[in-house]
């Protein structure tokens, strides 16, 4: 039996976020299982955020990054915000040199900073919702 086929990326819930602790080199099978596990947990837990902790990853190629990026997009379509944390300098250099898509990626130096960033995003989101609610009520009061 291929050990890689049963290897999984551990997922845990913390502060209404799914934290994926990626501490192994990535491969296609592992990324497929990760996507399935993550999206399933996202649906069942109703978490509103995902933090991908890459602190254990020493190298990532363009195809693996695209797969991770695709998983982040899927999670976003399910209503969760994604933050990448713990990318090592060599990994960051490789991603930039490979010219992979890193636009609109929210990132943090480490897991603690990612949790703080997620909390800040929640506050901003709540403030925006409150402002929109007030604007809607004011518009109704004006007869609009």
Where are these regions (language model features)?
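Solvent-exposed alpha-helical segments within well-ordered globular domains of core cellular machineries
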Residues: 32, 36, 40, 66-73, ...
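STAS-typified acidic loop motif
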Residues: 7-35
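Domain-level recognition of nuclease-like catalytic cores that cleave nucleotide substrates
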Residues: 20, 106-107, 121
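Amphipathic alpha-helical interaction surfaces in cytosolic regulatory modules
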Residues: 45-48, 52-101
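Extended, hydrophobic alpha-helical segments
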Residues: 6, 25, 34-42, 50-51, ...
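Short acidic-hydrophobic, aromatic-tinged amphipathic segments that line or gate anion-handling sites
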Residues: 103-114
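Short, conserved, surface-exposed binding loops centered on an aromatic residue
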Residues: 10-13, 40-44
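Intrinsically disordered or compositionally simple regulatory linkers and C-terminal tails
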Residues: 1-3, 120-144
